[in-house]
């Protein structure tokens, strides 16, 4: 399989997002990289499903709560930016204060 660097990055984010999803299902609190991967993967999948940028910006704030991440993680992540592929092209999605 011959993937571009961008495709490799997307695959890595998606895989890390799956690991984070499984840990959440077991009740394990997510660390910084897991939190970023979980939210990023969900945003990328939402884009592929045809959701709008505005919808994803709001959706990104509903994915995780403070109780689901390790102490101090919400303060470490003031925003997340993901370059996602939408049906009409690639766009940048920015989620401010992703963990309420």
From Swiss-Prot:
Enzyme Commission no: 3.5.1.5
Naturally occurring in which organism (per UniProt): Pseudomonas fluorescens (strain SBW25)
UniProt subunit comment: Heterotrimer of UreA (gamma), UreB (beta) and UreC (alpha) subunits. Three heterotrimers associate to form the active enzyme.
Coiled coil spans: none
Gene Ontology cellular-component terms listed: cytoplasm
Major site of localization recorded for this protein: cytoplasm
Protein's cellular compartments: Cytoplasm
InterPro entries: Urease_gamma (IPR012010), Urease_gamma/gamma-beta_su (IPR002026), Urease_gamma_sf (IPR036463), Urease_subunit (IPR050069)
Signal peptide stretch: none
GO molecular function, one term: urease activity
GO annotation terms (biological process): urea catabolic process
Pathway assignment: Nitrogen metabolism; urea degradation; CO(2) and NH(3) from urea (urease route): step 1/1
NCBIfam families listed in its UniProt record: PRK13241.1, urease_gam
Name assigned to this protein: Urease subunit gamma
Similarity remark: Belongs to the urease gamma subunit family.
Record key words, sorted: Cytoplasm, Hydrolase
Catalytic activity: urea + 2 H2O + H(+) = hydrogencarbonate + 2 NH4(+)
């Amino acid at each position: 399989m011959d993937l571009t660097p961008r495709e490799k990055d997307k695959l890595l984010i998606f895989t890390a997002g799956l690991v984070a999803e499984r840990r959440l299902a077991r009740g394990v609190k997510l660390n910084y990289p897991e939190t970023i991967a979980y939210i990023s993967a969900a945003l990328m999948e939402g884009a592929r499903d045809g959701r709008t940028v505005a919808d994803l910006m709001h959706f990104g704030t509903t994915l995780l709560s403070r109780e689901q991440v390790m102490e101090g993680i919400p303060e470490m992540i003031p925003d997340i930016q993901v370059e996602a592929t939408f049906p009409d092209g690639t766009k940048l999605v920015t989620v401010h204060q992703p963990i309420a």
